[in-house]
């Protein structure tokens, strides 16, 4: 009886030593693994969006969510992104698409005009967040503008 008690006590001690020698994974380490998986999924989603946006016009590449500030600064320097360059690009684009051309004040004239503008656009929209929610939609826009009339311009008397 004494021998059996001694052996069972020895087994219990060995089991406790064995369990304490292999600690369970802490919450922090499993949380870090989850964050890495989320980061990878976010990168993949960003790359999918970038591949799908080939037809869009961008002034510069936006920084990714998980890039360090140093990487963002390097990209900003490489692409020469300054306020002046952004304003120049906006002005160039507005001049390119602007429909109004001003004439000098000394010019006189009169006449008729007609204006006809059509616009069609088709695209898709994708959205995803960190909780795994996603939304996808397609859109189509058709627009037609027209006008006609008479004009007179020049110095008024």
Curated annotation (Swiss-Prot):
Annotated signal sequence range: 1-21
The keyword Secreted is assigned to this record: yes
Principal cellular location given in the protein's record: secreted
Top-level taxon of the source organism: Eukaryota
Keywords, alphabetical: Host cytoplasm, Host nucleus, Secreted, Signal
Keyword Secreted (UniProt): yes
Region of interest (Disordered), ranges: 124-157
Disulfide bridge map: none
Record-level GO BP terms: effector-mediated induction of cell cycle reactivation in host
Biased composition regions of type Basic and acidic residues, renumbered to the chain: 128-138
Compartments it resides in: Secreted; Host cytoplasm; Host nucleus
GO CC entries: extracellular region; host cell cytoplasm; host cell nucleus
Biological function: Effector protein involved in the induction of tumors in infected plant tissues by the fungus. Required for the reactivation of plant DNA synthesis, which is crucial for tumor progression in leaf cells. Interferes with the MAPK-triggered phosphorylation of maize SGT1 at a monocot-specific phosphorylation site, resulting in both modulation of immune responses and reactivation of DNA synthesis during leaf tumor formation.
Complexes and interactors: Interacts with a maize homolog of SGT1, a factor acting in cell cycle progression in yeast Saccharomyces cerevisiae and an important component of plant and human innate immunity.
Protein name: Secreted effector protein See1
Organism of this sequence: Mycosarcoma maydis
Gene: See1
């Amino acid at each position: 009886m004494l021998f059996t008690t001694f052996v069972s006590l020895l087994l219990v001690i060995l089991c406790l030593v064995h369990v304490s020698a292999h600690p369970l994974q802490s919450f922090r380490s499993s949380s870090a693994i989850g964050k890495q998986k989320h980061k990878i999924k976010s990168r993949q989603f960003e790359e999918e969006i970038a591949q799908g946006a080939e037809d869009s016009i961008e002034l510069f590449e936006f920084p990714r969510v998980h890039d360090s500030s140093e990487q963002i600064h390097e990209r900003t320097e490489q692409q020469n992104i300054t306020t002046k360059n952004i304003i120049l690009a906006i002005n160039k684009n507005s001049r390119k698409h602007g429909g109004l051309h001003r004439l000098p004040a000394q010019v006189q004239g009169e006449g008729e005009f007609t204006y006809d503008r059509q616009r069609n656009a088709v695209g898709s929209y994708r959205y995803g967040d960190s909780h795994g929610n996603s939304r996808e939609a397609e859109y189509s826009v058709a627009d037609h503008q027209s006008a006609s009339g008479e004009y007179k311009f020049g110095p008024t008397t």
